[in-house]
């Protein structure tokens, strides 16, 4: 096109004008006009070219009595055979030809796009629970929390010396007694609990307790803490306002401080997504609707 003669001026259009009209960079055009360069490995070739060295690597893997040997041991066996080459070259060739030792890639996972929401429309629909730790003069203590995903209300807080599956149930028991009026079989039907895949939450005792209360287990995706984000966010608030700023002599003192923090948090902490209302105000506003739905 640049060599085409203009009928009005009698001169060729020129490369600069054509690139400007077509909105194309001249550097890109010059680059594609050059013949492609043959790709060659940089540096010295070594004692063997790549095809022959790959054949030696395959022979080592075939004759080795062990399975799963990686590129480092293959490189060492090459040196024992008198073939001296670099470790990176052995790694590159084994990677290109699929000869590396199998790694723990895990099971194939589905879509991981976090394009949904973990915030339900009403209270007492989805609670989240998680565990953190705190230090006292008696040693480390396990701190368990339970949070309503809709209102961000803390429905349960507990501290214990041991972070067992039985201690992990205490925040949920607190919330069920207060918001469902007791502790009986099927009393919390319609509630789901979001938790991670920790040993406490996946234990038979924990899951049996949920089924007894009528609670549906809702585990988050593996290695996806966003699914339990409400409990994670509350733990951050708890650390910044209590666990990291106060010293506790005993675990019992910590437990009592957690109960006091729960009352203060629910009555004074402001939730931005609800128009800067407190969790207690959100619950009070929805109580008539919840009672009618029940």
What are these regions (language model features)?
Residues 1-13, 54, 58-65:
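Short, amphipathic alpha-helical "recognition" segments used to contact nucleic acids or chromatin
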Residues 2-33:
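Structured, non-catalytic alpha/beta "coupling" segments that mediate domain-domain communication
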Residues 12-14, 69, 85, 249:
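Residue-level signal for the short linker/turn that defines the boundary of a DNA-recognition helix
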Residues 18-22, 29, 57, 74, ...:
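Mobile genetic element proteins and their domesticated derivatives, centered on retroelements
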Residues 19, 30-126, 224-225, 278-288:
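Basic, flexible linker segments flanking DNA-binding modules
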Residues 46, 195-197, 203-210, 217-240, ...:
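RNase H-like two-metal-ion nuclease catalytic core shared by retroviral integrases
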Residues 52, 80, 84-147, 153, ...:
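Mobile-element integrase/transposase regions
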Residues 211-215, 237-294:
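C-terminal domain-tail junction helix/linker
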């Amino acid at each position: 096109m640049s060599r085409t003669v203009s009928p009005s001026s009698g001169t060729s259009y020129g490369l600069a004008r054509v690139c400007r009209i077509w909105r194309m960079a001249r550097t890109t055009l010059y680059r594609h006009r050059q013949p492609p360069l043959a790709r060659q490995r940089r540096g010295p070739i070594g004692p063997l070219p790549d095809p022959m060295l790959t054949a030696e690597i395959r022979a080592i893997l075939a004759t080795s009595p062990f399975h799963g040997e990686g590129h480092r041991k293959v490189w060492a066996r090459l040196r024992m055979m008198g073939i001296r080459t670099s470790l990176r070259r052995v790694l590159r060739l084994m990677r290109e030809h699929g000869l590396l030792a199998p790694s723990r890639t895990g099971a194939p996972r589905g879509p991981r796009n976090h394009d949904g929401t973990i915030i339900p429309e009403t209270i007492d629909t989805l609670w989240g629970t998680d565990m953190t730790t705190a230090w006292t003069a008696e040693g480390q203590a396990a701190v368990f929390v339970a949070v309503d995903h809709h209102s961000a209300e803390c429905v349960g807080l507990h501290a214990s010396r041991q972070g067992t599956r039985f201690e992990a149930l205490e925040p949920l028991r607190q919330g069920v007694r207060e918001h469902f009026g007791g502790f009986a079989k099927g009393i919390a039907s319609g509630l789901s609990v979001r938790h991670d895949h920790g040993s406490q939450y996946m234990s038979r005792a924990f899951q049996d307790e949920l089924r007894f209360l009528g609670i549906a287990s809702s585990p988050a995706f593996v290695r996806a803490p966003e699914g339990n984000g409400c409990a994670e966010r509350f733990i951050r608030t708890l650390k910044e306002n209590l666990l990291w700023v106060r010293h506790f002599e005993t675990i019992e003192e910590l437990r009592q401080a957690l109960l006091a923090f729960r009352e203060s948090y629910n009555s004074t902490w402001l939730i931005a997504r609800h128009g800067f209302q407190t969790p207690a105000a959100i619950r009070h506003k929805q109580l008539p609707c919840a009672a009618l739905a029940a």
